[in-house]
Regions:
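Conserved PLP-enzyme active-site core in the AAT-like
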Residues: 139, 172, 179-345
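Short loop-beta-helix segment that forms the pyridoxal 5′-phosphate
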Residues: 152-179, 232-234
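Active-site C-terminal subdomain of aminotransferase-like
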Residues: 314-419
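Short Gly/Ser/Thr- and Asp/Glu-enriched loop/turn motifs at secondary-structure junctions
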Residues: 159-160, 202, 426-431, 471-475
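Conserved PLP-binding catalytic core of the aspartate aminotransferase-like
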Residues: 423-459
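N-terminal entrance/gating region of PLP-dependent enzymes' catalytic architecture
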Residues: 2-160, 461, 465, 476, ...
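PLP-dependent enzyme catalytic core of the Aspartate aminotransferase-like
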Residues: 472-528
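A short linear hydrophobic-aromatic micro-motif
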Residues: 161, 420-424, 464-469
Length: 528
């Protein structure tokens, strides 16, 4: 019996040894570089084939249809062979992916990317650099800091400014509200939230932002314990910018109630309209009432590098903090985003010294540990993508590309405005267009809501074009978001033709019979 147990143990040990040997053959290192190159060639073949044959931005598949493909996939049973795995990925992912580089992808703030940034992504992922501390990242630390400093020079926030890369605009806006909350609590009560938690009267803190600002401000308020009720939504003017009279009135009412103006969030490029709030005027109001001024330039930040449109961000230099998404108007892969603050001392709110990672002694010695200014610990080396793009493509060319899609938006506006059966409700400040199909029959708003929902879902189902949707004054609208330099006015004309085709098709049909089932079926599906 003892001998049998020994034999079993030896057998198990041998199996473990074989598995370990197999893992060694999969590790990225000099011994396996030839195998890695073979894998890269296989990936490139698949990419070339995919890009060459991709005609539409989307396959049109529904979630419940795609879900069926995953039935029977057993992740506990490896395929082992790279070619087999790539064929599976092609079927499960690439075949039904959404292609932002297609000229008729006009939906969300997703940009096609410069290929040089993909090369940088490959480098950063291959080395697997983590940038939270100097002893894990070396030169990567200084590349990120260089990108931060370069952006700060464009923002002109001053000598005490600093910043850090984040996962995206939502995290950057969360950091802004976190710093604003703690600054105000310390200012009015001498209270240190980091040590003591929130003061007893924290519900007096209020955040003022436009009704069309990004929803992440509400999310941040909830996460920070302030709640949605802490956010005061300020009406907008005819250009969908925060209305200054309404802002002043809202602040006055707040102060009369004994509340505290914690922060004012201005938007430089709203998601729907691309509208830019009057930053200089808002900065004056914020200064007068002692509020933290945050500028969400996740979308409009690309104006910083444009040859002819930098002036649209006048006043951003007055901000206490700024959000910029390079993965929008700088044509970088997701994610590539950063948060900036006028006074770097405020970043101490997110600093915690762990002896095993970033002890205080290292900071005192001048060691540049980036986790000292981030709410994240482990963090990817996203800055290399933009660094490499600046060194190979150049900031000016990236800026010209953004101006190109802005010009296209102006052309698109003129086209839509010339169509009698299309109602467009704003002129573009950046590269979005909000409009709706109205037909020629004087349909009610409720009917127009239904037809515009149908139009969007039909476009997606057929895969011919992808557009976005939004609501304005409780009415259903469609939206073009233009971020692709390859998109032409002809592409927009063709999409408008399809919009009108589906619109009239719906209006002419028996809504209760022929198209109601399809409409109801599609109603259950969200396309984002």
């Amino acid at each position: 019996m003892v001998q049998l147990n020994v034999l079993l143990a030896d057998s198990q040990q041998q199996a473990s040894t074989n598995e370990a040997s197999s893992m060694l053959n999969s590790m990225f290192n000099k011994e396996n570089i030839d195998n890695f190159k073979i894998g890269l060639e296989q990936v490139m073949q698949l990419l070339e084939q995919t890009i060459a044959t991709q005609q539409k931005p989307f396959s049109g598949i529904l979630p419940q249809e795609l879900a069926k493909k995953f039935i029977g996939i057993d992740l506990n049973q490896p395929l082992f062979d790279i070619q087999d795995a790539l064929e599976e990925v092609a079927q499960l992912y690439l075949k039904d992916a959404v292609y932002f580089n297609n000229p008729r992808y006009l939906a969300h703030l997703n940009c096609p990317i410069v290929y040089q940034s993909i090369l940088a992504e490959l480098l950063a992922t291959s080395i697997n650099t983590a940038v939270e501390t100097w002893d894990q990242s070396g030169g990567a630390t200084f590349i990120e800091q260089s990108i931060v400093d370069w952006t700060l020079s464009k923002l002109a926030l001053g000598e005490q400014a600093d910043g850090v890369f984040t996962s995206g605009g939502t995290q950057s806006n969360l950091m802004a509200m976190l710093l604003a909350r703690d600054f105000q609590c310390h200012l009015y009560a001498g209270h240190t939230n980091k040590q003591q938690g929130l003061p007893h009267d924290f519900r007096r803190l209020k955040i003022f932002t436009s009704k069309v600002s990004h929803f992440s401000i509400q999310k941040a308020a909830a996460i920070l314990g302030l709640g949605y009720d802490a956010v005061v939504s300020v009406p907008y003017d005819e250009y969908f910018r925060m209305d200054m009279t309404a802002l002043n009135q809202a602040i006055e009412h707040c102060q009369q109630q004994g509340d505290i103006v914690m922060a004012i969030v201005a938007t430089a490029g709203t998601t729907d309209f691309g509208s830019i709030d009057p930053l200089t005027q808002i900065a004056e109001i914020a200064k007068r009432c002692g509020a933290w001024l945050h500028v969400d330039a996740a979308y409009g930040g690309g104006l910083l590098i444009t040859p002819n449109n930098k002036h649209k961000l006048a006043g951003i230099e007055c901000a206490d903090s700024v959000t910029i998404d390079y993965h929008k108007s700088f044509f970088q892969p997701v994610s590539c985003s950063a948060f900036f603050v006028k006074d770097k001392q405020h970043l101490s709110v997110v600093t915690y010294h762990a002896e095993y990672l970033n002890p205080l002694s290292q900071q005192q010695a001048g060691t540049p540990d980036l986790c000292n200014k981030s709410i994240q610990t482990t963090r990817r080396f996203d800055a290399l993508k933009l660094w490499f793009s600046l060194r190979t493509v150049g900031a000016q060319n990236l800026g010209v590309a953004f101006e190109q899609v802005m010009h296209l938006a102006r052309q698109g506006y003129l086209l839509l405005a010339s169509e009698a059966d299309i109602e467009i409700i704003h002129q573009p400040q950046l590269s979005t267009l909000v409009f709706r199909f109205v037909g020629d029959s004087g349909a009610k708003d409720s009917e127009l809501d239904a037809v515009n929902k149908y139009i969007r879902k039909q476009l997606s189902r057929q895969g011919e074009a992808l557009i976005a949707a939004t609501k304005v004054a409780d009415k259903q609208y469609l939206k073009f978001t233009l971020l692709n330099c390859a998109t032409t006015i002809n592409d927009i004309q063709q999409v408008v033709r399809l919009i009108k085709q589906y619109g009239y098709q719906y209006l002419a049909s028996d809504l209760a019979n022929e198209h109601a089932p399809l409409s109801l079926a599609l109603e259950e599906v969200s396309y984002g």
